[in-house]
Swiss-Prot record:
Residues 86-107 are annotated as: Disordered. InterPro entries: UPF0229 (IPR006698), vWFA_dom_sf (IPR036465). It comes from the Bacteria. Pfam families: DUF444. PANTHER family: UPF0229 PROTEIN YEAH. Transmembrane segments: none annotated. This is UPF0229 protein bll6755. Belongs to the UPF0229 family. It comes from Bradyrhizobium diazoefficiens (strain JCM 10833 / BCRC 13528 / IAM 13628 / NBRC 14792 / USDA 110).
């Protein structure tokens, strides 16, 4: 017999959820492009709120069948501008509201409001952590055990006493099994009875209750329940992202704003995209400290600059909490490129000997003043050091930003989906 399931859940906001999802699937590339364009002009907080995007109306046409009388290739008579073989281009200069006759076709647009979740999903759709594969384990999942309700058979060690007693009580009530106090009252009445005829009736009633008690046991084998467990796949590949940020005195408010925006976007990306990624926030001046999210983004700090302090702090945390044989380790660093001259050698040693050998990927973001005039001069000492390491084959990517509008494209470039090492090795 067929089973019919009717979903009577209300659509959100009185809208057709099925039509909305169908539209997003069909126009995904157009909507995604509009999201990327809109996000470049937004604040991170605005990105999380969703909003209105605009896509070309021409991209909304659905395929349909129509009659066609054959293919014709001709130029109608009466024009002095075109000949056979010319391409006709859309003018695009008019508007739907004010263009008059003969002023060209308008570029109509379709405005669509995205929810918070839809906006973030589309923006992060083609981003991922590079090479997310545990290097010493080929498989990506292992078997784990978790509770999965109850069963009528199992090991005595797994008996659920509470569930068994609950089911037994429900069965006794349903079958009206005589209670102990009822039997005791009847026995007391028999002992106190002096009338022989009445005593016979009471004895017959007692015998009836005792027989029913035997037929309906206190706990029946059908009542017994065992805790049930089942094996479920558990991810083996674990990832941890270290966020390193320079908050020293050489970092202007504009630079700190750029760095914070980059890390806020990274934080949203990781929390939204992956369930099994841990994030460690480390900020540094001439000394480094691990802080929480609120302090990392909004806590005031200033001082000198020693990049090695942040790298040393990261190394210590990796050694204590994140075994490289079990964890995929990623790091993203934001700085203005300034570093103490005496700290350069130690920074290089920490990177080459301690940090990069255990990292799957290391991203360096160098922030500058608005206009990027400083980037036109010679490279910073930190940029020169990192560039040398990158050219030697280290898993390191580098970018420079000086404007808010550059944060999103740079972030997308750093974390766009790439071929994994297994895919590259495959024939």
């Amino acid at each position: 017999m067929p089973i019919h399931i009717i979903d009577r859940r209300l659509n959100p906001g009185g809208k057709s959820l099925e039509n909305r999802q169908r539209f997003l699937r069909r126009a995904k590339s157009l909507v995604q492009g509009a999201v990327k364009k809109t996000s470049q002009e937004r604040d991170i907080k605005d990105v999380l709120e969703g909003g209105e995007v605009t896509i070309p109306l021409d991209g909304m046409h659905e395929p349909r069948f129509r009659r066609e009388g054959g293919t014709r290739d001709m130029v109608l008579p009466g024009n002095k501008k075109f000949v056979e073989g010319d391409y006709l281009q859309r003018s695009g200069q008019g508007s739907a509201k004010d263009s008059g006759p003969g002023e060209g076709d308008s570029e109509d647009a379709f405005r669509f409001v995205l929810s918070r979740d839809e906006f973030v999903d589309l923006f992060l759709d083609d981003l991922e952590l590079p090479d997310l594969a545990k290097r010493k384990i080929a498989q990506t999942e292992s078997e784990g055990i978790q509770r999965a309700g109850y069963t009528t058979s199992g090991s005595p060690a797994n008996i659920s006493v509470s569930r068994t007693v609950k089911l037994a009580l429900a069965r006794r009530i349903a079958l009206k099994r005589p209670r102990k106090d009822e039997i005791e009252e009847l026995e007391a009445a028999i002992a106190a009875c002096t009338d022989e005829d009445e005593r016979v009736v009471l004895l017959a009633e007692l015998e009836k209750l005792m027989a029913k008690t035997k037929r309906i046991p206190f706990i029946d084998p059908l009542d017994i329940r065992y805790r049930r467990f089942e094996t479920v796949p558990k991810p083996v590949a674990q990832a941890v992202m270290f966020c390193l940020m320079d908050v020293s005195g050489s970092m202007s408010e504009h630079m700190k704003d750029l760095a914070k925006r980059f890390y806020m976007l990274l934080y949203v990306f990781l929390k939204r995209r992956y369930k099994h990624v841990e994030i460690v926030f480390i900020r540094h001046t001439d000394r480094a400290e691990e802080v929480d999210e609120q302090t990392f983004f909004y806590g005031p700090a200033s001082g000198g600059t020693l990049v090695s302090s942040a790298l040393q702090a990261m190394h210590d945390i990796v050694r204590e909490r994140f075994n490289p044989s079990d964890w995929n380790i990623y790091a993203a660093q934001a700085s203005d490129g300034d570093n103490s001259y005496s700290d350069g050698e130690l920074t290089g040693l920490l990177l080459t000997d301690k940090i990069l050998p255990v990292c799957q990927f290391f991203a360096y973001l160098e922030v500058g003043e608005s206009g990027g005039s400083a980037f036109d001069l010679s490279d910073s000492s930190l940029w020169t050091l990192y560039e040398r390491l990158r050219n030697s084959g280290a898993p390191l990517s580098m970018r420079k930003v000086s404007e808010r509008s550059e944060i999103f494209p740079v972030f997308h470039d750093l974390f766009q989906r790439r071929e994994t090492s297994q895919e590259k090795a495959a024939p």
